[in-house]
Every structure is written in C-alpha cells, then in structure tokens.
Amino acid sequence: MRADKISNLTLARSKFLDGVVFTYLSGFGLSISLILAIGAQNAFVLKYGLRREYVLPIVLTCAISDAILIIAGIAGFGALAHALPWFETAMRYGGVLFLFWYGLQNALSAWRGGSALEGEADVTTSLRKTLLTLLAITFLNPHVYLDTVVLIGSISAQYEDRLAFGIGAALGSFTFFICLGFGSRLLSPIFANPAAWRVLDAIIALTMWVIAISLLL
C-alpha cells in the first residue's frame, strides 16, 4: 500500500514537472518567435552591438522592458488596453512620429557616411541618451503592446501555470537579446568598412519607415 502511494506521488510529481517544463518551453519559444524578425528594437541592438558600445546596458534594458510587458500581459493589462480605445491610437501616432524621426537620423548617417569601427575616434552618444532612445523605440511602438502584452497575455491564459509561461517568455527575450547584442561583434570585420555601415544605416532607416507606414495602414 505504501509503495503504491509513493508510486502515485512520484507519477503525479513527474506529470506536474512535465507540465511546468512544457509551459515554460512554450513561453520561451513564443517569445523568441515574436522578436526574431528584424524590427526597430532589434536593429538598434544590432547597431550598438557592432559598435561594441553600451552593449550590456542595452541588452538588459531590452530584456527588462520585455519582462515588464510580459508581466503586464499576464496580469491582464491587455484587457485594459482593449477597454481604452484611445490608448492604441495615441501610441500608434506617437510611434509613427518617433520612427520617422529616428529613420531620418539613420538615413542622414547613411548619406554622409564615414562611420566605421574606429574605436574611440568615433563620436559617441551618452549612455543616458542612448537608453532613452531605446526606451522610446520600445514603448512607443504599438506592435510591442499587441504582440507582447495582448498576444502573450491571451495565450498565457490557456495554461494552468501562467508563472512558468511568463518566466519562459522573459528568459526567451533575454536569451535573444544577449545573443544579438554580443554575437553581432562576430560581424565586426565586415563593418570595418565604412560602406558596410552606410548600408546598415540605410537598412535601419528603411526598417523604421516601413514599420511607421504599417502603423498608419
């Protein structure tokens, strides 16, 4: 009898752990799939990763921002956003203006050229201004709220252990940005050529403008 109880407890524990692991991996996979495509935030991280400038603060800011949005989604903020129609509209037009402006900065940089991996010889932006720009790119993009808050929030409701799902999603985001920020330096030999930077700046500008236009459609 005692052996049967132990066996049942072991089986129940195994099923519980299997469920938690599956839920965690589901959140992990969904998070990475949502941020895998190149976007405003990813392009920003890539650019600074190539320059090897403020990489850790940028990566941590992205990961923490995503974690906050994921928690908000799981906590039901998505339903609140749906209840406030003006919220999405305000974020959309604010995001459009900012993305057009940031795209213009990169377009001008691509036009002027002269950027390369020249270390301390380059003029750098302060850490504070860099992080404020990153936060604006992150939180002024309505797609972030639709994907991270609403989508992840609604999908997490399908799982019994929403905490495991949220942890998986947050760690998925952290893993992606760590790999993008620190892995991009492997491309440094290519971007030692100023022409490569002009191409990257042009691609980033086009990416920002495409996202901005898509918000208006």
Where are these regions (language model features)?
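Interfacial loop-to-transmembrane junctions
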Residues: 182-206
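Internal alpha-helical transmembrane segments of multi-pass membrane proteins, especially GPCRs
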Residues: 29, 56-60, 92, 132, ...
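Membrane helix-loop-helix hairpins that form the core translocation module of multi-pass transporters
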Residues: 55-125, 129-130, 183-186, 206
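Juxtamembrane boundary at the C-terminal end of a transmembrane helix
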Residues: 213-217
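Membrane-embedded alpha-helical segments of transport systems
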Residues: 60-72, 140, 145, 171-177
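Juxtamembrane transmembrane-helix termini in multi-pass membrane transport proteins
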Residues: 15-89, 149-164
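Alpha-helical multi-pass membrane helix bundles of inner-membrane/thylakoid proteins
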Residues: 2, 6-16, 88-90, 101-142, ...
